Amino acid sequence: MKHLHLYILSALLMTSFQLSAQVKLGEGLEADKTVHNFGDIKLDSGPVSCTFTLTNTSDKPIVIYQVVSSCGCTDVEWTKEPILPGKKGKISATYSNDEGPYPFDKTLTVYVSSIKKPILLKLRGVSVEKPKPLEESYPEHIGQIAFRTLELNCGNLEQGEVKSDAVMVANLSNSPLNVSFEDISPDLDISVNPNPIPARGTAEMSFSVTANRSRWGKNKYWATPVTNGKSHQEKRICIHAFTRESFKNISENDKSSGPRPKFDESTFQAGKVRKGDVIKATFSFKNEGKKAFGVYKVDIDAPQWAHSRISPTEPGAKNSFTVEIDTSDLPEGEMLTIVTLTTNSPLRPIVNLFIAGWID
């Protein structure tokens, strides 16, 4: 009886995991994944195939209108008949694997009846002439689990979205490796499959970021690997993502009548400065829209920086803000620093400004 209870609990946990692993593509449509990673494949092994499964969670039929591959090296087939509520459809792709011994990243652009924007699916992998040792293919080691890199990118997402991706990881040991994660950043989900990872084998590490209105612009999400119960605090996985406002549910008229900043200059010329000096750059703008303009976040690609507060700007009003760049940690020579504003403007949700100069 005890074993039966454990079996039922295990089955429930597995079912719960599988349900949570579904990726929401839009209102009423989910997928089992948006990225398929083939890992390392031999160049002479021939074509490789995968399948994406879509589930209709709405109360109306959904039609896959078209699936377009990013190159002629990938053939695609999909469910042509309407997908009824609660039912599933499939998109199958075959990569020719004849482009040479290189990494590949192919995109399938999917057009469906229920979603205005096209859905992007990815096929990834590395085609190799001869298999390399795991230690060489996955140079970043944390205990017995190995990665190609510890710096991952989840891309851009809008508020209300969940963005997912996946990479391959390896088990360097001669026995199965159980993998879990701790100290996981809020809004990040991360898991490995299969788990445990077979001895001297590979697995897919899937991760997803859920947009949160407390996080805007550039963000980092962290996770610490735990292998066979041992925590590895010496290194952590870092996942980058960029979050912007969502305007998908507003009309074209509302977009055109929304806030619209117009900057006097998009580039501040700092001229020649000495290394260690602080550059002070002021950017002025006018809100030519019909609603108040606001900035959710300012990101600056420099080691040491600060900026003044950007107060809400009413229609027709002018405003300005100042950015300070400490050049102590910047290399000598030409500099070009990007200042990125994440805003509430439907026409300019992202504004890039620049600080140019020369550091002696």
Which sequence ranges carry the predicted segments?
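Short, solvent-exposed loop/turn segments enriched in Ser/Thr/Gly
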Residues: T34, S45-T51, D98-T107, Q159-A166, ...
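Short, hydrophobic beta-strand segments
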Residues: I91-E99, M205-R213, F321-D329
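Short, acidic/polar linear motifs in exposed loop/turn regions
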Residues: T57-K60, E99, S114, L172-S175, ...
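Surface-exposed binding patches on compact interaction domains or structured appendages
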Residues: G28, S58-K90, N174-T202, K290-S320
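Long, low-complexity ectodomains and other extracytoplasmic segments of secretory-pathway proteins
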Residues: A21-P47, T53, S114-K163, L172-S173, ...
